[in-house]
Amino acid sequence: MKDVAAAAGVGLKTVSRVVNGEPGVSEETADRVHAAIRELGFRRNDGARLLRQGSRTSCVGLILEDLADPFYAQLSRAVEEVARSHGSLLFTGSSAEDPARERELTLDFCARRVDGLIVVPTAADHGFLAPELAAGTAVVSIDRPMNGLTVDTVLAANRRGAAEAVGHLIRQGHRRIGYLGDDPEIFTAAERLAGYRQAMAEAGHGVDEAWLAMGRPEPVGIHLALDRMLSGPDAVTALMCGNNRTTVAVLRSLATCPGRTALVGFDDFELADMLPVPVTVVAQDPMLMGRMAAELLFRRMRGERAQAQRLEIPTRLVLRGSGELPC
């Protein structure tokens, strides 16, 4: 705050009033203070007003892609259970796959002096968290690794799980297998696509790029992709879906299409076993991932200084019927 006061040419009390939204400061002076804050990158530390330096708040933060997603909902529940067992409160936010929102949430949590953070990364570079890490905030990455920051990381075996699913379809006699996945800029989407390509290559099968559809799981786009994949002499006979939202959108679209197409989805989802043709899936274990990430976080918060770990949690192929339809 001293630097802000000096840059704005005002006293510390004036800066404090502006930062805390108190009256008694002219608009022109407040503008100068805000300009200095932006230039210097100052952020109010709410906890510092209440706590002695070096004390703990017994609060941790969790930043997910979308709390409404069943996968992340289970992961959040597991983290919360571990936090509670350690006497800590969990704050949760959704980034909506927006790097700017992720950064804003992350730094807001840090400004409120959470003791640690578990983050599903979306940004291309997480170097902005280095000062927080150096200041003693524990950080763990989950579901995807962070770029520009070396921290404990908990992942699912995305590539291996996708390769196992495609290999299973190949063993049912399928050679032309379509793949529908999320934005390939997302780590999990890229890994699962790589697993698909790996399994096809290991079986000696080429991949026609027309068999691929990558992007956000929008119903219209998925329907158009399926029209392309399922028509013509080289139509695919089986489909691999890269996440649960894509699988659900594909199933809705297939309900209007004639024929029976084999399908395996990555991620389990509610009622997948209750459909007319139960859905074969690659099941992740979000509860285990959440527990392991949280335990790593609390070990760091207790002062553990060991080298950062990268843990990969195995997936499980659950055979239910849709992936066993023959060519």
Question: Can you say where each PLM-predicted feature lies in the sequence?
Answer:
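N-terminal helix-turn-helix/winged-helix DNA-binding helices
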Residues: 38-71, 75-77, 85-86, 108-111
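Short, solvent-exposed amphipathic alpha-helices that sit
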Residues: 32, 70-85, 161-164, 187-206, ...
